[in-house]
Amino acid sequence: MLTYNCLPSFESDLKHLTPEQHAAFCRVVKRAFVPDLCAGRFRAGLRVKRVQCAEGILELSWSMGAGPAGRATWEYGRACHPGARHITWRRIGTHRILKHP
């Protein structure tokens, strides 16, 4: 089971995505990110890695097609339920979000 919350920065960034970008992010989260997070191992295509110079913050790529790559930053949080995982979504957008993850 996965629980999550979003920082205001994530919610603000989300408003700047196109409907297509928003749909792509949701699709990747539902079909790949959540199952991989629950399994404890991420597939290579998500490109999950630590953000440099930002301890505890990770990034994933949710779009690698034409145009700028879609990125989202997140961090693990305290589980709300025994055996559950909890994350906090921090930012979403292009590579530029990594300047202030």
Task: Report each predicted region and the residues it spans.
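Arg/Lys-rich, positively charged N-terminal/basic patches that mediate binding to nucleic acids
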Residues: 1-32
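Residues that form or immediately flank small-molecule/cofactor binding pockets and catalytic motifs
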Residues: 9, 53, 94
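A short beta-strand-loop micro-motif that forms or neighbors metal/cofactor-
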Residues: 25-32, 36, 45, 82, ...
